[in-house]
A protein has these predicted regions:
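Structural motif
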Residues: 18-20, 189-193, 231, 332, ...
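Low-complexity, glycine/alanine/valine/leucine- and proline-rich hydrophobic stretches
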Residues: 335-402
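A residue-level signal for conserved active-site and pocket-lining positions in enzyme catalytic cores
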Residues: 22, 66, 108, 178, ...
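Active-site-proximal N-terminal segment of extracellular/periplasmic enzymes that hydrolyze or transfer
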Residues: 1-47
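Anion (oxyanion) recognition and catalysis
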Residues: 43, 108-109, 224-225
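Short, structured active-site-proximal loop/turn typified by the sulfatase FGly-forming signature C/S-X-P-X-R
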Residues: 29-72, 116
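Secreted, luminal/periplasmic, and some membrane-associated catalytic domains
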Residues: 21, 57-58, 82-95, 101, ...
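His/Asp/Glu-rich, glycine-adjacent segments
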Residues: 67-203, 209, 278, 284, ...
């Protein structure tokens, strides 16, 4: 057994491939079932259910929870972006210095198991690859010519240029890279994580979404045919966040607080990342710093804002969502299914989402698929059926829960 972060994992005799299909609400796969014969067959012979994502339902916290097997309260990664109160600066949470524990991947490499990690988004590469002496690269990096020596054979075998970050094919390339990884290297454990451009732009069942999932299905089928244990989940779901006229539905929280007299209010939007075309930095989760202001009055004020669903103070949020208390504000605010939280109108470039906004971050994007191409042991299948699985249990299920 390989023990990391208080959880023990078996290494398996066949490759184990964990896949995060970024932004894939279960409804995408249901709507695309007719064009996903491989996934349908895998789930029929294996196991299928729905798991919970970490809140905030954003990319970094969920990918790192899956990579470490533990929630943000332990691994430290509670957003794509956070406010460092020590330095007084707002920073992207992409640097491994923010990680507070090792990954499953580095622990497996230390135990002598060869590991491969492929991410579409380069922003995840350093976090996922921390302490990993193995294959770890991003498709975004390949496009920019940054191909590590360990990945050259894989990239050559794919034999086509890496797509742009705003091209649906970048995620297809990522999953195909997993196939070529298994074909060219002796891999014990792999993790493939895509990007959610398609889900931000197209609804479940749309021709564009179904065409995308049909492409993904082809390479998922290849992984299955190679004899791997395949485990599929997502980092979060996705919902429309629009007014009746189709414009983005936003409450500019910092503006509202300052105008109401909470002069020192600073709103941090942990969805913030380099990919503003996806979401305009608008999601359904925010954390609020109030300085020395009247925190009691602020809570009552925010709870009355239309579209705000839940306001928790620091200790409540840390306990309920298993978050690191020192990396969130005085309050955590979650919006309802169709509302996003902004800072100030001038802080966002709304032109990138004027044709419509689909986003995530709140409680309504917490349901994610949990699919395995093998049967699960009864204790695991009953946990999944009861809705008690977290997406960060992915490798526990794949390594320990899958029947031989």
């Amino acid at each position: 057994l390989i023990t990391v972060n208080g959880r023990s994992y078996r290494s398996r005799t066949v490759p184990v491939v964990g896949i995060c299909l970024d932004g894939t609400d279960p409804s995408y796969l249901q709507a695309a079932a007719g064009v996903m014969p491989n996934l349908t067959a895998m789930a029929a012979k294996g196991s299928r259910g729905v798991a919970r994502s970490v809140i905030p339902s954003f990319t970094n916290p969920n990918n790192i929870a899956m990579a470490t097997g533990v929630p943000p309260s332990i691994n430290g990664i509670c957003g794509n972006y956070y406010y460092d109160q020590v330095t007084g600066t707002e920073v992207m949470m992409n640097d491994p210095k923010y990680l507070r524990c090792p990954t499953i991947f580095s622990a497996f490499v230390e135990a002598g198991v060869p590991v491969g990690v492929v991410t579409a988004k380069d922003k995840l590469r350093l976090l996922l690859g921390h302490g990993l002496n193995g294959i770890c690269f991003s498709v975004e990096g390949v496009r920019k010519g940054a191909v590590p020596d360990s990945a050259r054979r894989i990239v050559e075998k794919i034999g086509r240029p890496a797509p742009d970050i705003y091209d649906p094919e970048i995620s297809v390339y990522c999953i195909e890279a997993g196939v070529r990884l298994l074909e060219t290297e002796k891999i014990g454990l792999a993790y493939l994580t895509t990007t959610d451009f398609v889900q931000h732009k197209y609804k479940p069942g749309s021709p564009e979404a179904n065409a995308f999932y049909a492409r993904i299905d082809h390479f998922v089928g290849c992984l299955d045919q190679l004899g791997a244990i395949v485990a599929i989940t997502a980092d979060h779901g996705m919902n429309d966040k629009v007014n009746p006229d189709g414009s983005p539905k936003v409450q500019f929280l910092e503006t509202l607080l300052v105008d109401a007299g909470f002069r020192e209010a600073r709103v941090i939007l942990p969805i913030t990342d380099p990919y503003v075309v996806h979401h305009g930095a608008l999601g359904s989760y925010a954390t609020v710093y109030l300085g020395d202001g009247n925190t009691g009055g602020a809570r009552g004020f925010m709870e009355k804002i239309p579209g705000v669903e839940l306001v928790l103070d620091r200790s409540e949020a840390a306990e309920r969502f298993q978050l690191p208390a020192d990396r969130i504000g005085n309050f955590v605010v979650l919006a309802d299914r169709s509302t996003t939280l902004g800072r100030t109108p001038s802080w966002h470039d709304l032109s990138v989402v004027e044709s419509g906004l689909r986003s995530h971050g709140g409680l309504h994007e917490q349901s994610v698929p949990f699919i395995f191409n093998r049967q699960l042991h009864p204790t695991y299948s009953s946990k999944l059926a009861a809705g008690e699985a977290n997406n960060f249990d992915l490798f526990d299920f794949a390594l320990n829960g899958v029947q031989d």
